[in-house]
Amino acid sequence: MSRTSAGFADFFPTAPSVLQQKRVRAPRDRPCPKDRPEDQLHVQDDNGQSSCSPGTSAANVSTNGSPPSVSVSETGTGVENSGCKLVGETNTDITGTDTSILSASLAQCRATQVNEARFDNLTPVTNAESSPPRKLSPHQSKSVEVAEYESNKFATDESKLAATPLHTPPTPRSQTSRSGVIKGCKLVYDPDLEKRSSKEKRRKPQYVDFVVNEQDGCSPDPRLSILNYTRGAGCKQKTKYRPAPYRLKQWPYDTATTIGPGPPVQIVVTGFDPLTPVAPINALFSSFGEISEINNRTDPITGRFLGVCSVKYKDSTSFRGAGPVPAATAARRAYVECKKEQRIGTRRIRVELDRDGAVSDRIVARAIESQRMGHKKNIVGEEAKVEPQAKKNEPPPTAPKGPSRSSTRPVAAVPEGPRASFLKPAIPSLIEETPILAQIKRDPYIFIAHCYVPVLSTTIPHLKKRLKLFDWKDIRCDKTGYYIIFENSRRGEEETERCFKVCHMKPLFTYIMNMESQPYGNPNYERSPSPERLQAERRERAERERLKKEADLDLEEEKKQRAIDLDPCREVLALIVRDLKDKLLEDVKSRIAAPTLYDYLDPDRHAARRRALGIPDPEGIRRHTFRLDADNFGSNNPRSFLPGDRSFSPYGLNILALPRIRKARRLNRANAAFLDERRKQPVRRKEVRPLYHRLQQLHDVDDSDEDQRTPFSRDIDEQDSRPPSRMSSRSSISDDGEESEPLDGLAPQGKRHESRLLGLEYEDSGNTLNEAVDGYSRHDSPGLSSTRKRKRVAEGIDVRKRPKEESERSQLNRSVEAGDTFYEESQHSEAAELGTVKPENLAGIGGKFLGRVEDRSINEDGEKENMERLHIESAIQGANLGIQQPLPDESTTTKSHEDPITEIEWGVSNDEPRPTVVDDETIILDLDGWQNLVKDEEDLCFLRHVLDGQSRSKVGNLSAWAWRQKEIKALNRAGESGPVHQETRIPDYYVCNPTGAARTEGRKRILESEKSKYLPHRIKVQKAREEREANAKSDPHASSAAEAARISAAKTISKSTSRSTRVNNRRLVADINAQKQALPMQGGDGDVLRFNQLKKRKKPVRFARSAIHNWGLYAEENISANDMIIEYVGEKVRQQVADMRERQYLKSGIGSSYLFRIDENTVIDATKRGGIARFINHSCTPNCTAKIIKVDGSKRIVIYALRDIGRDEELTYDYKFEREWDSDDRIPCLCGSTGCKGFLN
């Protein structure tokens, strides 16, 4: 084997690493004790093989005591990395006494392994030329040990680079096993660390070796666990994790190369005291650059400062003797510098960059909203505090009242500092308004009703966590409950079933999840129709739209043609012809047809025909004179015009009793044909007073019956339409106990109007007693004869008077003969006025006369008429007492039983009890209705019994309250009083929705013309206007005098107003001059002062409901002509934006227009951001005008007074819309002035 090459230690023996290795090797090189047996040099392992000691590294030692033999290969190519044995074909025995030789040979072997390793031969080759091993010198032994250490150091690294051929035989385990290897040493004692005197003898350092068994401590290569590491897959470069993008240096703004907005040149300042003047703010921020504009923002309504200031810079070529300072640099510097706790006064300010003014507008809006809410809370608190004091210090009722709240201006609250934090935006609610079930089609879902788990937005996150084990898609909720929605697939259906089985009736907090599973989606969902059906519906819809469009076009064409053919003269002529036709037809009916019918129906002309047919002649029905509607129009009976009268109905019409023409009383003959029978006529009250008058004692008992008459029941509930009442039908015999009166004496004074029952007309000498009888019985059924009707009425009245004393009947029976004689005399004496009357006709009349004497009221026409009536009454009474009443025949009785309806309606009950008064269910139960319903003590007792459980209302004085309620009713019903059948309301004011509710109605626009019909304030103004016009037409002199008085009063007011205005202007100028002296003189101060002057010159106005349209603007004080009133404030937008917004407002339902044009390209939009000036309405004759002025280089709209305006007068100006010709969408004008043009456009 060749000699080993020199190592690093041989060439560099003084190197620090070589010296260190020598110090480490020093303890190991110590000689072993001589008495140590040789067999201790070898340690036998578990397999029976001897391993080398630490001093020798490796040896082949026999176990039977023979000298050990070492086999060393001459070439050294058969040495393995992990073993320490040397295998060769030529073996040489080495004695065990000389261990240094073994170590030297081992070192030589390792050096050869390191430096002369060959990879092409695995089998050691025996070479005869190789020299045998020789004994090494001591110097050579040391060098070998150093080489051994170096070989141990680099053995592991060299072995990794060695390539193993494919046909390498496996190394036996006996060859790979090695003993413990010294990896290093540990210093256990260091004499340098001892705190001893230097004179003492110092000990040597002590070391302990680290011995590691390579077989146990060799760990596997971790790189081999990487997949495809040997192929290079593990060597891919990994990307670097970057949690944030790199901060690159911003490019400087260059106007030549930059597209888009430049850096901000404006800042917004907040946090300072709102009462801080502009001077300190200006002084602070002018130190950063030249200021172009500074604006201390104010409330557009109240005008108080908000504590928000906008500062805008401009480029400066030379700022304070230095170089140029761009506006963007100044704004940036101000923003950076003011971050360092800059203060104005005692408050710390906050500065933000504001590129286009959006930041300042947002802050101003929040500040205004917060101040509004704070002001409302303060007002509520002050009212709550002041209320108990006001109750204690109430003035007496007779004390004069102070001005109303609307006439005094509310005191503005002291402005407060800005809020530290603005209102946080509201968290959007997760509860959907639209029903979710209608949106779910085929998606599986589980429903939890709101009755089991309350619907709250905060419950959804907890429910999601509760169901996190299931694969749901979404969880939504509405007012009905929660919907857990899954995927629309087979897996989603399975998840639905699994979730239902696991969580059904399981707790969620303190609630139970009662679930409803729908794995196949909404059960009520219907699929969309087929394409053929959709196409058919589209065709039908298109056809309907086409037909509708054609109909509309035809209608429009017809309207245009009518407008072209319209001729006012022809229309007037058509109206005249139509009126003449009606008048001619009326004259033909009254002058030709009526007399012809009367002549044709004259009983004398049909006498022969009646005799031929066996019909008896009509007696007591014929009228001797010709008159038209005598019983209705010419009669003195005021009840003939009431709705309850049936004289015009077919049931009450008798052919033989047709009316005759005669002069009517209290009626214009020219208007007789145009009267309506339903029209209410002024009537006299009855003498019977209702219970209300009895309780209140409004009238004395001794009052005249004709002076005080109150209705007993409603106006149409007459004696002719209901059974007679005992209270209203008294006998001529007094009820105070007197049983008889002189037969030929005069009637009592209180019964002078008893003949009005019969409808007798004494001024006409042709009226007879038969007419009176017919006038009473003409409401009976037309199938009954007049004789039978008279007998039935007489019988009914006699039955009604049965409870009277029996002495009345005996007196009537004893006076039959005297009655006959009296009848004959009265018949001859009054033949000219009463005509011929048979005894059987008068037999059934007397009781009727006495029974209904006090049921009618009359108008006294003179003493002569009264005497004639009294004379007739005495004659009738005598006839009643002297003529015996015949019994009714069987035919009359049978007829009365065959027609019970007529008996119940018109007759008197003689078989069973009947109600005296039939209540009308259609009467509105207000105060008058209840007073009409309660007629006696019995009704009052029943009413008290019904109202026992109700609590009493405190109305104060009952009489005053009742009077006030009736006055309110009369005021709302145009003077009408008494019981009514319709509620007191404005006609067509409450219109029912077709769908039943306003929420289900679609959006529809109500025309202004329709609003003017039912809005109360518009109706009031319309009535006042009509009344004014009517007064002007009736009395033009009075209207002109009132106008002159109004003008003179306005002049007086305007003079005083002008004087006060001049005083206020002087004070204003003085304030402005004081501000000029206080502020530092700079370029923009003049514009600021002018704008402040414009703000202070505005007049106090208010907005309220207007009779013209919605809201209106009203003056709170007198305003002189040409005075500035208010500025039209709003958002300034371009014309294109204004057009787009107008369409959006119309779609959203905002019908009012608040867009005011400044010029061709600029429009002021005050719809959502504006002052109260937007409420000013249009008028064709306005009292204001709008002017466009320039303030601070910007155009502003200001409202000026055209004339003197009084207090509480509405402000109007002409909108000046462009005239639109041939337009169907014209806006109607509702100003109602004398010069109204009808339309705005």
UniProtKB/Swiss-Prot annotation:
Which PROSITE patterns does the record cross-reference, listed alphabetically?
Answer: POST_SET, SAM_MT43_1, SET
State the organism of origin: Aspergillus fumigatus (strain ATCC MYA-4609 / CBS 101355 / FGSC A1100 / Af293)
Report which gene this protein is encoded by. set1
Would you kindly state one Gene Ontology biological process term found in this protein's UniProt entry? Answer: methylation
Q: What is this protein called?
A: Histone-lysine N-methyltransferase, H3 lysine-4 specific
| UniProt-listed Enzyme Commission number(s) | 2.1.1.354
Q: Which SMART domains match?
A: N-SET, PostSET, SET
Composition bias (Basic and acidic residues) maps to: 26-45, 379-394, 534-545, 697-723, 793-811, 1023-1036
Compartments where located: Nucleus; Chromosome
Q: What is known of its domains?
A: The RxxxRR motif forms an adapter helix that bridges the nucleosome and ubiquitin.
